[in-house]
Amino acid sequence: MICVNLPRLCTAIVTSFASSTDTAAVKMTLIVCNSFFKDRLMEILKENGIDYFTSWDNAKGKGRGTRPHRGSGAYPSTTSVTMIAFDDEAPLEALIRSIDEANREIQRPEDHIRLFQLPLERIV
């Protein structure tokens, strides 16, 4: 479960785009990875010129086909969640290619970096 401070979240989204953004093409991504791979994800974002994001560290959860990430006991690892809004498909597609490439280097499929893409209805 991810708990979000909505006013802070909305501020982060709004400051990423001008108010005239055509939201028809805007996509929201949630990138989820084992916290161990957070530094690699930040390298990928930098390599792709993406310097706008909101990130939550030490998130807890369990993905389909993965072990739990609870931050204690038998499951000491945690998850990192990074949210990015894109108003252009090109950097998003480049990011997806980079994540696919990084995942080929990560030996265990359960540790792969996951990107979830969603339509973003409106930015106010």
Locations of regions flagged by a protein language model:
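Positively charged, small/polar-rich N-terminal and surface patches that mediate targeting and assembly
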Residues: 1-124
